[in-house]
Amino acid sequence: RVDRSVPLDANWLRAHPLPRHAHDIDKNARGKVLVVGGSRNVPGGVMLTAEAAFRAGAGKVTIATIASLAVPLGLAMPECGVVPLSETDGQIADGAPVVADLAEQHDVIVIGPAMDDADAADSLLAALLPSLSPAKPLLLDAAALRAAARH
């Protein structure tokens, strides 16, 4: 098992400033980020993550979240693509097949913001990790970070 984690401390941030893009570059060349998460209890968490991705320089951001949040998020963030995932009791239910397909279309994957269901996060990781390229950045947050210990 290889530990690919990198501590993001002040020294690392100084050594890796946010990218400056040429004025003639389009959004497709700036990278696509997939944010997977959300729950009824923390509906704004994925929105904050998507906003951070844009501020860091992403050209396109897609949010995959519970179906009941998809329309409100789409209205709040029209610059994002929003993919509804099935849900049970305000948590992602069985999003693994959809998320695995989406992951192939994106450059960076973020799993877990605003998720509080460790089993759902574990299911997503189990579906993604075997097929995810080691070169593709994967950021884990909240329940996904806790679930990663099982893998």
Which residues does each PLM region occupy?
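Small-residue (G/A/S/T)-rich helix-start motifs and N-terminal tracts that mark the onset
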Residues: 1-151
